Amino acid sequence: MELVNILLESESERVKLYYDIPPKKSLRTKCEVDRAVKYFISVIKKYIKLKESTFYVVVKDTTLFTYKYDKGELTPVDNTYYTFSKELASTDYSSSEITSICFTITDDMSISVKPKTGYIVKVRSDNSRYY
């Protein structure tokens, strides 16, 4: 599974986060998606103040799963048929090189993100949809 609306950035590259499903799990369950979301948030918390932030987490497996993180509360939200463009990104994640975190939002997503000291928050908009 991959996190499609949040990228980590260093001076030289963008890093997309992935969550590996155990090999014996060919059918994805809600538990697996929940584990992936918790993993992604555990990485994101290194760069932003979670208790002061509101943002969306969009996980892609065979479909998109969208969650709203609101100052400690995680809630699933309805998919609004937005797509998220593919970014050129490396999968090599090294937290020592990260300087910023980039959120992709849509017209339906309002966010408020507080970065930790030394990190930059970037936001871009992508309103592409499939019908």
UniProtKB/Swiss-Prot annotation:
**What InterPro entries does the record tag this protein with?**
Virion_core
Example GO CC term: the record gives: virion component
The primary location reported for this protein is virion
Task: State where the protein is found.
Answer: Virion
Q: Which UniProt keywords apply?
A: Late protein, Virion
Q: Which domain of life is it from?
A: Viruses
What induces or represses expression of this protein, per its UniProt record?
A: Expressed in the late phase of the viral replicative cycle.
Please state which protein family the record places this protein in: Belongs to the chordopoxvirinae E11 family.
Protein name per UniProt:
Protein E11 homolog
